[in-house]
């Protein structure tokens, strides 16, 4: 984390940002780094703090813990699926664990089964926008969930499944993702 460049970029998300199924240099954060270097002729650092299986809470908590240390010019997030919710595993247990909310285990006191996950996503989105503004970082995000695109910058781009594992996006999708983030970064450099 000591690396400082002319342009410092923090990236975070889930396996889509880690680059599961593609070579590291093909993952969108590292394609983005090369695009920024090529078009600016400046030094660029990428701090990819993504982890496979991450929740929206993980993303915001990770940025919160590191933004003062890394001092990024840009925070680029590819939001994980919003069904990954961190919550107590039961009422008597103080440990918070990540759970996947499904129709059959959704809390009965919520009439609309999507209300809680949408609320938690928006709460985290607002917090991350405030964090990046307070730290003078430009915040850019996108998501695997098409319905959430109205709340973030840019257009939804569907994931192809051409990665080695057959489940995650392949190199072409990562290139498209890097170009999305570069388009927004390029407006500010």
Regions from the language model: what does each represent?
Residues 60-189:
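Alpha-helical cap/lid subdomain in secreted, periplasmic
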């Amino acid at each position: 984390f000591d690396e400082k460049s002319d342009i410092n970029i923090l990236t975070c998300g889930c396996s889509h940002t880690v680059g599961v199924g593609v070579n590291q240099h093909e993952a969108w954060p590292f394609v983005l780094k090369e695009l920024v270097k090529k078009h600016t002729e400046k030094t660029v650092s990428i701090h990819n703090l993504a982890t496979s299986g991450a929740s929206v809470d993980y993303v915001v908590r990770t940025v919160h813990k590191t933004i003062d240390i890394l001092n990024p010019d840009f925070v680029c997030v590819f939001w994980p699926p919003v069904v990954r919710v961190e919550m107590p595993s039961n009422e008597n247990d103080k440990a918070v664990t990540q759970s996947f909310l499904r129709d059959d285990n959704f809390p009965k006191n919520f009439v609309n089964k999507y209300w809680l996950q949408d609320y938690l996503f928006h709460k985290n989105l607002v917090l991350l926008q405030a964090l990046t503004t307070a730290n003078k970082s430009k915040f850019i995000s996108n998501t695997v969930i098409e319905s959430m695109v109205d709340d973030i910058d840019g257009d939804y781009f569907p994931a192809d499944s051409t990665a080695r594992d057959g489940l995650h996006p392949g190199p072409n999708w990562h290139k498209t993702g890097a170009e999305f983030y570069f388009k927004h970064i390029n407006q500010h450099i």
